[in-house]
Amino acid sequence: MTIAPAETSTTKQRILDAAERLFAEHGFDGVSLRQITAAAGVELALANYHFGPKTDLYIATIQRRADELNDARRRLFAALPPNPDVEGLIDAFARPFLDKSLHGGPGWKSYARLIAQTANAARWTRAVMTAQFDPVAELFIDGMRRALPAADPRDLYWGFHFLIGALTMIFAETGRIDTLSHGLCRDHDLAAIYARLVPFMAAGYRALANVKTGRDA
């Protein structure tokens, strides 16, 4: 099969766009490769040609935006002072996702839901989450070591675990907070959420760092 480079790029993007939307809506097991290629308007053989089996397409779908997200985070980390504060680190990690969700178009909305699913599925931990996101996660945790030098190292990892849980829930925009608050809070109001997220998580990190007794390993 001989395909021109420009056509190849366009075809791959169409497949990835369709996969991202359908995986986000139905999950990995709820959509077939045939359904994805039908939504993309391409032949099934082209998905196999460019990506291989559905598992590889799923990983490629995550990786496409992970690279962009991680690059933005690295730039913000690099701009921080040598001894950053807790708020600055949380902002550098979380803001790129906020900016993409607010201004990146519907694809980023689908991606947020997809990441929320992936982060909560053990089957993808090593192949996706570890491979795509751990290097930048370690940069964040290293920064926290400098910001909170007296903290128990375990708490730096637990704090990151809690932060990721909050981010995936927030940016997935499930509507849960809308229902729970009877409309007082809106999960699509990401700017309002973010204004509360950073001080909330920073206070949590500092509280963990200040706990000296009364906690088991």
Regions found by a protein language model. Name each.
Residues 16, 70, 87-94, 160, ...:
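Short, amphipathic alpha-helical "lid/cap" segments that border enzyme active or binding sites
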Residues 2, 103, 134-217:
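C-terminal peripheral helix-coil segments that are non-catalytic and often amphipathic
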Residues 74-111, 160:
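Hydrophobic alpha-helical connector segments
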Residues 93, 97, 112-119, 163, ...:
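Short alpha-helical scaffolding segments that buttress acidic/His motifs in well-ordered protein cores
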Residues 14, 22-56, 60-64:
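Helix-turn-helix
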Residues 87-92, 103-134, 174-179:
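Amphipathic alpha-helical segments used for helix-helix packing
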Residues 12-17, 51-74, 78, 130:
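An amphipathic alpha-helix adjacent to DNA-recognition modules
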